[in-house]
Amino acid sequence: FRSYYGHSIDNTLGRDANGKASKLKGALCLGSLDFTYNAHNWIARGHFDYGHLGDAEEVRLLPGRQTKTSPFNRDYVGKAAIACGLEVGYNIFSQIEKLRADNQKLYAFAHYEYYNSYIPTAMQPKFPYTEKHRMAVGLNYYPVPQIVIKAEYSQRFLKRQYNNEPSVSLGVAYEGFFL
C-alpha cells in the first residue's frame, strides 16, 4: 500500500498572492494498492489506484496552466481519477514433464482493467469517453527464464456512442541486468 498527500498549488505555478487563487490549496491525495501471487503454476496480479484533487473546479481557471499556442480554451480538471485491474495466468507447460524439466513456461492469461482519467465534480461537464473497460487474453511463452514471447488480443469497451477498440499485440521481451 502506498499513499501521498500534499498541496499542488504553488509548486511551480505562481499565483496572485492577494486574489481568489491565494486561498486555493489544490489538496492532492493519492492511494495505491497492489498484489502478486505466484505459486502452484498460477500467477495473479492486481492493482487499485485512486487520486483526488481538491479545488478541481478552480484549478482549471488558474493562469499559466497552458501555453499560448494551445488550441484549447481551458481544459477541465476532474476531482478524481481511478485505475484498477486484475490478471490471472496459468502455466500450461507445468503439466508436461519434459518442458517443465527444461524450465520452459507457457502462461495462458486473462486480464481485466477499468480506468477513468476524469471524474468530474457536480458542477463540471461529464465526458463519458474517459471511462474505459479493457479485457485481454493471451499467451506468454518463456523458452528460457530471461526471454518472453508475448501474444495478446484485447478490446477496450467504451460507452455506446463510441467505437470499441480491438487490438492484437505481439512482442518479445528480454529480462537482464545492465552493469
Question: What do the PLM-derived regions correspond to, one by one?
Answer:
Residues 3-179:
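Outer-membrane beta-barrel pore domains
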